[in-house]
Regions:
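Beta-strand segments within the central parallel beta-sheet cores of soluble alpha/beta enzyme folds
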Residues: 33, 70-78, 105-108, 131-138, ...
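Conserved catalytic cysteine-centered active-site region
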Residues: 34-36, 40-52, 80-133
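Condensing-enzyme catalytic core mediating Claisen C-C bond formation in acyl metabolism
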Residues: 1-47, 149-209, 213-217
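Conserved beta-ketoacyl condensing-enzyme motif
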Residues: 5-7, 48-105, 224-231
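Buried hydrophobic packing segments
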Residues: 54-61, 117-121, 214-215
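Flexible, glycine-rich active-site loops centered on histidine and acidic residues
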Residues: 126-157
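Acidic, glycine-rich active-site loops and adjacent beta-strand->loop/helix elements
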Residues: 11, 78-83, 109-114, 137-142, ...
Length: 231
């Protein structure tokens, strides 16, 4: 059996923090931010929690998939900014979506959270352990952002995304390529009750080297040329 995405959903807060407004909080301007990051605005969760955003995205994904919450037998939540140490975010999602038959666990993998969750869902489905998995990624990065640190505050915002992955005989998620470099863990950190601290140059160097390598590995696994990729 294959793991196939059958529905997606997302949620972004209403409040928009533009580059112009951000320039009143820290020494920067719209041109500086856009030329370096391509970012012109970010969404901020003024009221509500990480789980609130997650539930909104989850309900949209269930509706898009055309299934009931009771059909879900596993919920994987990916977040690095949970509201509680416990209960975990996935259990709160279960409660507020009515997914009473689901096993729940969380993943903390920062930017890689969705890929890690999708990889886990794929493995569980292909092993025959679960048939319908709800993946929800939700982050409230504004809560751990130093709004006086120009190197980080321009980058992050809040929001949530979700998808439903189902066991199917049809073509599904083809390949996953995962790696970890714990030796570089100190270049991007957020200690408990502290804000994000980032060595931007080291993060950039790692990303521009390793992401293309991973993409090429996946293309080789599937005997596919880069020119064949549509999006």
């Amino acid at each position: 059996m294959k793991a196939t995405i059958i529905g997606t959903g997302s949620y972004i807060p209403e409040y928009i923090l533009t580059n112009q407004e951000l320039s009143t909080m820290v020494e920067t301007d719209d041109e500086w931010i856009v030329t370096r990051t391509g970012i012109s605005e970010r969404r901020i969760q003024k009221s509500g929690d990480v789980a609130d955003m997650a539930v909104n995205a989850a309900l949209k994904a269930l509706d898009n998939a055309g299934i009931n919450s009771e059909d879900i037998d596993l919920i994987i939540a990916a977040t690095s900014t949970p509201d509680y140490l416990f209960p975990n975010c996935s259990s709160i999602i279960q409660k507020n979506t009515g997914a009473i038959n689901a096993v729940c666990f969380d993943i903390s993998a920062a930017c890689s959270g969705f890929i890690m969750a999708l990889s886990a869902a794929k493995a569980y489905i292909e092993a025959g352990m679960y048939k319908k998995v709800l993946i929800v990624c939700s982050e409230k990065m504004s809560g751990i952002t130093d709004w006086k640190d120009r190197s980080t505050c321009i980058l992050f915002g809040d929001g949530a995304g979700a998808c439903v992955v189902e066991s199917s005989e049809q073509e599904g998620v083809k390949s996953v390529d995962l790696h970890n470099e714990g030796m570089l863990g100190e270049v991007l950190t957020a200690k408990r009750n502290e804000n994000i601290v980032m060595n931007g140059q080291e993060v950039f160097k790692f990303a521009v080297k390793k992401v293309p390598e991973t993409i090429n590995t996946l293309l080789k696994k599937e005997n596919t040329d880069a020119e064949d990729i549509k999006y």
